[in-house]
Amino acid sequence: MFVSALPECFPIQYLYDYVKSKDKTERVYAQLSNSMKGDVRILKKFLQHIEVYGAEIAKEGFSGYVTEALIFYFGSFEKTIKKISELKKGQVIGKSTKKFDSFVVIIDPIDNNRNLGTAISIENLGKFVLASRAFLRNPSKNFFKKPISKRIMKNTDKIIVV
């Protein structure tokens, strides 16, 4: 009896898609100036502070790639915050001939038929808009501090301050 030791095989299309998607971040990041790369890091800290950074399904937040795309389109942290503070429902960031039905449309800089904004919840988008407006009214280093964990805040009745 002959037993094949070959692993499960997939059409080459999947490999191509994997390489293509992995390469997107590198291609966008390579187009950013050093100043813009610094602004990507600043934007990520800002989003972490308001607890909307993260691409996990449960988080429904802004991925690292989305932050890179926003800086790519707007050019700097300051311009991104200004544009986000003025954001309207259904507004399109980037250029695409395809129509999308979501609260915010952020066109993938590499694939203009892909909306990066579909995974972002309306609540997280709203937090970003409101935090951007607050930052513009009163810029502060406090917008970049690590957030206090909800787990810690939930147990504040058990904390003793000396």
Where are these regions (language model features)?
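Conserved catalytic core of two-metal-ion nucleotidyltransferases
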Residues: 1-9
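Short helix/loop capping segments that flank catalytic or ligand/cofactor-binding pockets
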Residues: 9-12, 80-82
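Surface-exposed beta-strand edges and their flanking turn/coil or helix-capping segments
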Residues: 11-16, 121
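E2/UBC-UEV (E2-variant) core
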Residues: 16-32
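Conserved nucleotidyltransferase catalytic core and NTase-mimicking acidic/glycine-rich helix/loop elements
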Residues: 35-162
